UniProtKB/Swiss-Prot annotation:
Classification via NCBIfam families: inosine/xanthosine triphosphatase, PRK05074.1
Top EC class, one word: hydrolase
Organism of provenance: Yersinia pseudotuberculosis serotype O:3 (strain YPIII)
Protein family membership: Belongs to the YjjX NTPase family.
Binding site for substrate: T8, T9, N10, P11, A12, K13, E68, A69
Full protein name: Inosine/xanthosine triphosphatase
InterPro entries, alphabetized: ITPase-like_fam, Non_canon_purine_NTPase, NTPase/PRRC1, YjjX_NTPase
Residues binding Mg(2+): D38, E68
Length: 180
């Protein structure tokens, strides 16, 4: 049985990780443990690079907390221009898989608060009246009226980040370069 460390205690993220591992390895083939670790980036990362660094840093910190595990999973949501998205980083042994989620264009009323230094989740809570938006459907769930959720969008990206660990083509050695 695989021991999977989720570098988060957020239920929406842990549910997405559970769905992805169910799809790839099957129910009952792993156990997930959530740990609260620092991302090393601001609470609201801005830009793809900063957001990706946050996800990688979460994995690094989770590995330090639980080095005996088999998988470490980091998810970091960010803002780039007028879009929200997230990076998924998964490590297993000495390999890494990464994927970026789908993006959602945000309305100006939300972006205004973000430009003033507030987090997307806090802005969504004020506008929607839902205090724990980030732990439920997220901005995605609110704006799509539940057709998509934070969990469903992250699930898809996590499936892509898991590909290097189960697709045999990723295990094949690179062909050697021909002599010149």
């Amino acid at each position: 049985m695989y021991h999977v460390i989720a570098a988060t205690t957020n239920p929406a993220k842990i549910n997405a990780i559970t769905l992805a591992f169910d799809d790839v390895y099957g129910p009952g083939q792993y156990r997930i443990e959530g740990v609260n670790v620092d991302s090393g980036v601001p609470l609201q990362p801005i830009g793809s690079t900063e957001t990706r660094i946050g996800a990688r840093q979460r994995v690094k910190n989770a590995r330090q907390v639980r080095p005996e595990a088999d998988f470490w999973v980091g998810i970091e949501a960010g803002i780039e221009d007028n879009m929200t998205f997230a990076w998924m980083v998964i490590e297993h042994l000495q390999a890494r898989g990464e994927s970026r989620s789908a993006s959602l264009m945000l309305p100006d009323i939300i972006l205004q608060g973000i430009r003033q230094g507030r987090e997307l989740g806090d802005e969504m809570a004020v506008l929607s009246g839902i205090s724990n938006v980030k732990q439920q459907g997220g901005a995605i769930g609110i704006f799509t009226q539940g057709k998509l959720t934070r969990t469903s969008v992250y699930h898809q990206a996590l499936l892509l980040a898991l590909v290097p660990f189960h697709n045999e083509i990723y295990q094949r050695p690179s062909p050697s370069k021909p002599a010149i």
